[in-house]
């Protein structure tokens, strides 16, 4: 059954987030040969439309307004619903991001649509789109179908591979005007944090800690190195269970799946559940006192040593490189 599917693209720090392309790929599956329409909301987003098309969208609709320069649920909901009424899609796809998790339930309620959140895989079987998502804190997975109304899903980042980019691919780009008003929230200032504020799913560099960090205080040298490298801090399930850090930092089968350019694993043994969340990193560096630790089997570079001795040395060397670069 061919469907029209509307995909929310997300722009952050002057570029489209990778999850936007993953959402387009998911939408292609849901569409079953139907049309995939990208949607971009913001103050100046039209320049990103072609990139969505290069990754598989058939056409893109943009809504630009200074009132959409920063995300608010009221403003984005107003703009989205105007586009929805014009397009009448049978499917909607968001990334399972802070924006997607906040906005999609509100829209699903307004549209009386069944929302399947945190989707890690999807397929078409027996005429239905079958969504796979984790349950019970990732201890199990369930498969769900939506039998009536609009198919509405949020896609967990780094789980569904984007389509290959085709810069020769063409599609129509149109704009709509929406009178965004009655906003209950006004963004006065955006304050950028250091390592803790970097989105793990988008980070190019991740410094991750396991039980070997020994305490909440033990994460301090990881954060210092992450700040120097402009990266994010992550953690294994073991470190989270031990209450060394928040579960929002968890990487692995039951946490976030990441694919950074550089992944430095500190005091992480390398349980298969953790490897499932980071083994596709471009370069993996392991630091562990145990030379037999499983993490070394997937590492490109290994350092057998005490992370509390190694990390300060790495931090100082990277600081020197930054000064001379």
Name the predicted role of every residue range:
Residues 1-325:
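N-terminal glycine-rich FAD/FM-binding segment characteristic of electron-transfer flavoproteins
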């Amino acid at each position: 059954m061919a469907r029209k599917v509307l995909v929310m693209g997300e722009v952050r720090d002057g570029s489209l987030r990778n999850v936007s392309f993953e959402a387009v790929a998911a939408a292609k599956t849901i569409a079953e040969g139907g049309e995939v329409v990208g949607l971009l909301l913001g103050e100046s987003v039209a320049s990103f439309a072609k990139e969505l098309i290069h990754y598989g969208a058939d056409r893109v609709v943009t809504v630009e307004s200074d009132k959409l320069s920063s995300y608010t649920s009221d403003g984005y909901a107003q703009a989205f619903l105007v586009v929805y009424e014009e397009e009448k899609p049978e499917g909607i796809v968001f990334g399972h991001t802070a924006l997607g998790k906040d906005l999609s339930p509100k829209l699903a309620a307004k549209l009386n649509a069944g929302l399947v959140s945190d989707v890690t895989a999807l397929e078409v079987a027996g005429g239905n789109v079958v969504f796979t998502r984790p349950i019970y804190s990732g201890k199990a997975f369930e498969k769900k179908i939506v039998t009536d109304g609009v198919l509405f899903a949020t896609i967990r980042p780094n789980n569904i591979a984007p389509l290959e980019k085709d810069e020769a691919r063409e599609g129509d780009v149109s704009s709509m005007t929406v009178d965004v008003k009655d906003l209950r929230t006004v963004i006065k200032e955006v304050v950028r944090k250091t390592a803790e504020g970097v989105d793990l799913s988008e980070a190019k560099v991740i410094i991750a800690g396991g039980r070997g960090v020994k305490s909440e205080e033990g994460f301090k040298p990881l954060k210092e190195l992450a700040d120097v490298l402009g990266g994010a801090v992550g953690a294994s399930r073991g470190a989270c269970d031990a209450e060394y850090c928040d579960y929002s930092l968890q990487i692995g089968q039951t946490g976030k799946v990441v694919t950074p350019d550089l992944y430095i694993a500190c005091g992480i043994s390398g349980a298969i559940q953790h490897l499932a969340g980071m083994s596709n990193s471009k370069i993996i560096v392991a630091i562990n006192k145990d030379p037999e630790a499983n993490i070394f089997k997937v590492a490109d570079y290994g350092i057998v040593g005490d992370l509390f001795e190694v990390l300060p040395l790495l931090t100082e060397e990277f600081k020197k490189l930054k000064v001379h670069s």
